[in-house]
Amino acid sequence: NQETRNGQRIRRGLTKHKAVDGYIRRFCTSDQSENNFIYYVLGKKERHTLADYVTGVEETSTNKIVLYSSAQTGKTTELKQLCWELQQSGLYLPVSFEVRTNTKLKRDDLPESQYVDGREVVLVIDALDEVNGQKYEDLLEEIGGYAYEHPEMKMVLSCRSNFRRERQLELFTELFLEELSIDDARDYAAKREVNSDRFMRSVFANQLEDFIKNPFFLSVLIDAYKGK
């Protein structure tokens, strides 16, 4: 599965992306502090999606992004949705890799050209934290070296927050995947044809409010609520 332009070849990472079933819209921030969420609640801060940052709707200091969040909070889903949205735009060509199936990824495996058939390549590498020890260090060295050699290339990585490596990824802008807000949970409940006010009252009555911050658990709660 290869695409070429002017003799430049993409060796690996091309796939036909699909929309994520039951996707819940997520937002990212470059500010990990509590103040960021407070400003949003007060209506003083706009929220931005990962695609906003990648495509330049929201400016960043670099064209390379590493997305951090805790384990099992939706990073892989977010990158899959990003690839789908980029593909659907017709302007971008997402080239994606999952580290768990590419533990020995080398820079020679990665795209050589910024554009293919008029579309801008976006290199997406999911779950750097799937490997550890020397394999992790080797992977970071390959990715960091590739980023240095290709300043023009848009790149998006994902990684658990406790695996942060500022020095090896100094060319990357750090973004953090936000937890779902109460309004996000309400909106998704309504989308699932649930009375959002009653659902939220049930959540708080049963002290389950921490679970609605995570898309997976929110979906499970709504399934349980609908089946009660």
What is each PLM-predicted segment?
Residues 4-228:
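P-loop NTPase signaling cores
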